[in-house]
Amino acid sequence: MADTLAIVVAAGRSSRMGEGPKKQYRLLAGRPVLGRTLEVFEHAPAVDGVVLVVAPGEEDWCREEIVTRFGFTKVVAVVPGGEVRRDSVWAGLQALPPCALVLVHDGVRPFVTARQIAAVAEAARECGAATLAVPPKDTVKLGGPPGAPVSTLPRENLWLVQTPQAFRFDVLIKAHHLARERGLAATDDTSLAEAAGYDVRMVPGAYTNIKITTPEDLAFAEALLGGGPVLVGFGYDVHRLVDDRKLILGGVEVPHDRGLLGHSDADVLVHAVMDALLGAAGAGDIGRWFPDDDPTYRGISSMDLLVRVAAFLRERGLETSNLDAVVVAEAPRLSPFISRMRDNLASVLGVSPAAVNVKATTTEGLGFTGSGAGIAAYAVAALRRIVLPGDRVL
């Protein structure tokens, strides 16, 4: 039985966002908001799996364009939601495998951190129900229509509730059963737990854990992600063409009478890309990371090495903003394979293929590439720092 599973709810109609795509599918620094939210859960050690709840009819699109495209392996199911939030969470509960704890999270809160997820889960393990929350900074007044008398609420007793909210599985099931029997509606799941007689523990959240609901929220989120300079790196690599070797470029086996000589699979394109990424991060080069005299890397797929570089970038709070690469080869003709190379690179780096460009050219018979002695590759990578509130200062 899994220990902790999450229900990520993204079935809203997005009426307050205005015209255009729904809020969960709007691009935030080049990636869908929902994709950024799922990214946090994908790399949160406290979470074993995720059930994604979307609007009816959007399941296949989300599986293909978000879950599969960005490689979210923890998503165990994508299910249709209901008319109101309570029904959507209930749909997610029905799709959950057996587990001890359940987290419920808004799909449009991409700035929650792995540390906060772990804290709220541990609190629910101890007391049954917990939520992230922050005290209000502003004075809060209670009143009716404009012009009606108002009263000021004591701020020290108030909390602004966020997600994720965490529950022991039996607690959340009972709360939803009672809510359905009584016809209770609520804007969050802790309200249902309270109505069922359970106490809910407040766990300190962060003011940056915003729910993106309006265009103003989206602009604020862009500012959170976009702070700091763009980091640029350049990569170059070359390998000799020899007999009795496969030709691997961008993780694609390209039919040819010769292949590239190297300690690994000699994927010259991926090597140039890794050098560009490491250069942008100020982290040396592939010779330092993967020495050619280390037997560990003999014959290894360069795509596997790129996976390690991508993981390092995430640990450093960096993500790829844009990648442009060119392969220089007189032969073979590479255009039929370019799109697969691009998709392979984008998948490992966790970005949209639109952020990756791969092209091929020749040197018109000049030099070692023109004579067919070898193949070269150049790459330029741009990285951005991701702000991770509460986990680290970047």
From Swiss-Prot:
Assigned protein family: In the N-terminal section; belongs to the IspD/TarI cytidylyltransferase family. IspD subfamily.
MF-aspect GO terms: 2-C-methyl-D-erythritol 2,4-cyclodiphosphate synthase activity; 2-C-methyl-D-erythritol 4-phosphate cytidylyltransferase activity; metal ion binding
Organism of origin: Desulforudis audaxviator (strain MP104C)
Domain of life: Bacteria
Cofactor(s) recorded in Swiss-Prot or TrEMBL: a divalent metal cation
Annotated protein name in UniProt: Bifunctional enzyme IspD/IspF
Described purpose of this protein according to its UniProt entry: Bifunctional enzyme that catalyzes the formation of 4-diphosphocytidyl-2-C-methyl-D-erythritol from CTP and 2-C-methyl-D-erythritol 4-phosphate (MEP) (IspD), and catalyzes the conversion of 4-diphosphocytidyl-2-C-methyl-D-erythritol 2-phosphate (CDP-ME2P) to 2-C-methyl-D-erythritol 2,4-cyclodiphosphate (ME-CPP) with a corresponding release of cytidine 5-monophosphate (CMP) (IspF).
Residue numbers binding a divalent metal cation: D237, H239, H271
Record-marked site positions (Positions MEP for the nucleophilic attack): R155, K211
EC number(s) on file: 2.7.7.60, 4.6.1.12
Pathway terms, separated by semicolons: Isoprenoid biosynthesis; isopentenyl diphosphate biosynthesis via DXP pathway; isopentenyl diphosphate from 1-deoxy-D-xylulose 5-phosphate: step 2/6; Isoprenoid biosynthesis; isopentenyl diphosphate biosynthesis via DXP pathway; isopentenyl diphosphate from 1-deoxy-D-xylulose 5-phosphate: step 4/6
Catalytic activity annotation: 2-C-methyl-D-erythritol 4-phosphate + CTP + H(+) = 4-CDP-2-C-methyl-D-erythritol + diphosphate; 4-CDP-2-C-methyl-D-erythritol 2-phosphate = 2-C-methyl-D-erythritol 2,4-cyclic diphosphate + CMP
